[in-house]
């Protein structure tokens, strides 16, 4: 096992001037499970392929442990890779597929069999060792691909969207198995996905990329609670965070018919940038619903005593999920229509076409600079 270091590693494809990966700088600890996540074209798979030796590194360096592997061929890096497609040999049994790399390396049959059986036991594949891949389900085939990587006992596992071909239910159970197995083996793992739910549930840390640039690397909890900028705020979380540009007013920001208090430091930082507005982020679960004619929360002040507190939201769609419900609606903010998502109790969902008044909880408010997108609140 070993640590992995991306030291300002860059990749520029021939014929392009814009880097696909731009000075990526991440230190991955020995035994850590790091997830690279981002939209299509952000550079996450390219970063993984650079680490694997399948892409040239045009600037910076990549190290595995104390070794600079920047220009080493893949076979000399002591890594094992699991792909989106299983890449199993259809004419070979499960056991032969899992042990094939060891056979090519000249390991004796007894040792190969022992390692294959040990990996099969970990992956619940013992009863399938004599079967061909066509006799397995998608989840079982993916576990065979995992087993093939495990028997090699590499220093680093690389996984490129290994769950993309599985159905939703199987994806949930398999991601749990992969995370549990990685913790048991303690092998440093770099995992690529476009699914931020996978990223949050599997990784010790998550690295978010956009247009080849690292936006933030942090624990899943910190990334959810303290996104570094507007992109991360809008990308991490399902349903996504509501992002609303609101005017700065005395002591806070104007939110519908209420003034929501915001720290003076954040407002000063926005003013120093010449901004007269800030963009506030509110998770769907951090809205309070105000009854018609009811008062605002104690921490809020109202512009008018006649109107309900907060922002009027027209209910367009309601998703009932048992314990919770999600209201998808629209509101007028600064003369523009904004789509909002509000979480409500599963037993108290509003009717489609009705109107809610909502206020954000001040302690849960995220404040970003409208001009730059960077976070202003602690």
What are these model-predicted stretches?
Residues 239, 252-378:
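Non-catalytic connector elements of ABC transporters
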Residues 15, 55-63:
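Conserved post-Walker A/P-loop segment of ABC ATPase nucleotide-binding domains
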Residues 5, 27, 63, 357-359:
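ABC ATPase nucleotide-binding domain
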Residues 52:
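Helix-to-loop junction immediately C-terminal to a conserved catalytic motif
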Residues 37-39:
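The feature captures the beta-strand-to-loop junction immediately N-terminal to the Walker
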Residues 61-63, 67, 213:
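ATP-binding/catalytic-site motifs of ATP-hydrolyzing domains
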Residues 1-3, 11-23, 72-76:
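A short, flexible loop at the N-terminus of ABC-type nucleotide-binding domains that lies
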Residues 74-231, 235:
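ABC ATPase nucleotide-binding domains
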């Amino acid at each position: 096992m070993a640590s992995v270091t991306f030291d300002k590693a860059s990749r520029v494809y021939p014929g392009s001037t814009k880097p696909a990966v731009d000075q990526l700088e991440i230190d991955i600890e020995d035994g850590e499970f790091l997830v690279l996540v981002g939209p299509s074209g952000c550079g996450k798979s390219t970063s993984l392929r650079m680490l694997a030796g399948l892409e040239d590194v045009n600037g910076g360096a990549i190290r595995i442990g104390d070794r600079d592997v920047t220009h080493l061929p893949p076979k000399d890096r002591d890594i094992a890779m699991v792909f989106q497609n299983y890449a199993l040999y259809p004419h070979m049994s499960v056991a032969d597929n899992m042990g094939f790399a060891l056979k090519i390396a000249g390991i004796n049959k007894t040792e190969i069999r022992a390692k294959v059986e040990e990996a099969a036991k970990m992956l619940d594949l013992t009863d399938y060792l004599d079967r061909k891949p066509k006799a397995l389900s998608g989840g079982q085939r993916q576990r065979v691909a995992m087993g093939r990587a495990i028997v090699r006992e590499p220093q680093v596992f690389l996984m490129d969207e290994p769950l993309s071909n599985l159905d939703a239910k199987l994806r949930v159970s398999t991601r749990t198995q992969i995370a549990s197995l990685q913790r048991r083996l303690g092998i440093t793992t770099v995992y690529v996905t476009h699914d931020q739910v996978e990223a949050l549930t599997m990784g010790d840390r998550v690295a978010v990329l956009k247009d080849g640039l690292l936006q933030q690397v942090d624990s899943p909890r910190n990334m959810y609670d303290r996104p570094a900028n507007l992109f991360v705020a809008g990308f991490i979380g399902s349903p996504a965070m509501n992002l609303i540009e609101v005017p700065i007013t005395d002591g806070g920001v104007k939110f519908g018919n209420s003034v929501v208090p915001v720290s003076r430091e954040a407002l000063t930082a926005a003013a120093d940038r010449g901004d007269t507005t800030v963009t506030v982020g509110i998770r769907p679960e951090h809205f309070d619903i105000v009854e018609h004619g009811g008062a605002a929360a104690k921490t809020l002040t109202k512009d008018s005593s006649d109107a309900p507190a907060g922002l009027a939201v027209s209910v367009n769609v309601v998703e009932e999920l048992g314990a919770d419900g999600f209201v998808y609606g629209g509101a007028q903010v600064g003369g523009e229509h904004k789509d909002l998502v509000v979480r409500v109790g599963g037993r108290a969902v509003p009717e489609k076409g009705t109107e809610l008044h909502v206020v954000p909880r001040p302690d849960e408010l995220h404040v970003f600079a409208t001009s730059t997108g960077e976070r202003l609140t602690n």
